[in-house]
């Protein structure tokens, strides 16, 4: 559906989104790798009721993910133009590509936190909470994009909808994890 909204702004914007998402994927694919490792680590230690080890592993992965997100943010926000030019050097695409990378750059740390938090939940065998939050907030991108694109933001409204939904997911999921983890300790 977002592609349909973007298509109203022309082929250049579609290309910008495709290339921009591939560039941005470097951070979320890496964070996904951390989440997969964390899922296995949490699951193994949850089975042996080693909560101290779980907490230590989560802290280490969280710091690595925040560092990854910070590097991605710096790269996308401050070096978006040279990065984008590596992939597309068409003058009419560059300003839009830089906007895409900059706007998505602001969400890199929360996005990394979102992804590893899902890995933590999965390690505990709790898939409903992150699934519901992810589905609702990812789905919220559509009405947000429709609203934002009707303003002076234009196609940048789609990029803001994507970025804001990631920021909210990366802010809400850790709170739910904290509450879930607190409940787990009380039940253990």
Name the predicted role of every residue range.
Residues 3, 16-74, 78-80, 111-125, ...:
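Small-residue-rich hydrophobic transmembrane alpha-helices
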Residues 3-7, 149:
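Short amphipathic helix-loop junctions that connect adjacent transmembrane helices
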Residues 6-24, 92-98, 126, 160:
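Interfacial/gating helices of multi-pass transporter permease domains
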Residues 42-107, 148-188:
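Short alpha-helical transmembrane segments in multi-pass integral membrane proteins
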Residues 140-149:
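Transmembrane alpha-helical segments of integral membrane proteins
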């Amino acid at each position: 559906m977002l592609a349909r909204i973007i298509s109203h702004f022309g082929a250049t914007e579609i290309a910008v989104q495709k290339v921009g998402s591939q560039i941005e994927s470097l951070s979320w694919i890496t964070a996904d790798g951390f989440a997969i490792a964390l899922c296995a680590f949490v699951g193994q230690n949850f089975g042996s009721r080693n909560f101290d080890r779980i907490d230590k592993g989560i802290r280490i992965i969280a710091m690595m993910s925040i560092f990854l997100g910070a590097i991605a943010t710096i790269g996308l926000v401050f070096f978006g133009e040279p990065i984008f030019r590596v992939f597309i050097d068409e003058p009419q695409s560059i300003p839009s590509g830089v906007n895409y990378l900059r706007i998505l750059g602001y969400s890199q740390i929360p996005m990394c936190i979102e992804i590893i938090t899902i890995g933590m939940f999965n390690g505990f065998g709790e898939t409903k909470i992150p699934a519901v939050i992810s589905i609702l907030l990812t789905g919220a991108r559509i009405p947000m994009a429709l609203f934002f694109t009707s303003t002076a933001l234009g196609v940048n409204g789609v990029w803001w909808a994507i970025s804001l939904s990631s920021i909210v997911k990366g802010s809400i999921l850790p709170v739910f994890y904290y509450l879930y983890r607190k409940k787990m300790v009380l039940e253990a």
